Amino acid sequence: MAGRGKTLGSGGAKKATSRSSKAGLQFPVGRIARFLKAGKYAERVGAGAPVYLAAVLEYLAAEVLELAGNAARDNKKTRIVPRHIQLAVRNDEELSKLLGDVTIANGGVMPNIHNLLLPKKAGASKPQED
């Protein structure tokens, strides 16, 4: 039966490649697809939806980690702690808008001193004339 099935002596089964590696991503496309299906967000989930969502999540994570790493380096630290993530998110305009209602545990608050509480500048005051 020529042309049907595998030929004798073929190389065997192909090595399985994950959808994440096919898309060039680190985030798990299969797990995100499973969560989308189990979450009942829709009756059916397209093949490209979990890949796209994984890519978006990976981009956001990379962006936050890069900014948090910069904040850690500015503070002369080698380990990123929640404080560095808080500083990174709140100093970035777009991330701050996206995560405006999010509370980061152990993140602290942004340093802010009201202008009225700052000491007066010496050169700003005019000398009084008699």
Swiss-Prot record:
Alphabetical keyword list: Chromosome, DNA-binding, Nucleosome core, Nucleus
Free-text tissue specificity from the UniProt record: Low level of expression, mainly in dividing tissues: floral buds, margins of newly emerging leaves, expanding leaves and the meristematic zone of root tips. Also expressed in many non-dividing cells of the elongation zone of the root.
Region (Disordered): 1-23
Compartments reported by the entry: Nucleus; Chromosome
InterPro entries: Histone-fold (IPR009072), Histone_H2A (IPR002119), Histone_H2A/H2B/H3 (IPR007125), Histone_H2A_C (IPR032454), Histone_H2A_CS (IPR032458)
Protein's UniProt keywords contain DNA-binding: yes
Post-translational modification: Not ubiquitinated.
One GO biological process term: response to bacterium
Family (UniProt): Belongs to the histone H2A family.
Protein name: Histone H2A.6
Species name: Arabidopsis thaliana (Mouse-ear cress)
Upper taxonomic lineage: Eukaryota, Viridiplantae, Streptophyta, Embryophyta, Tracheophyta
Gene name linked to the record: RAT5
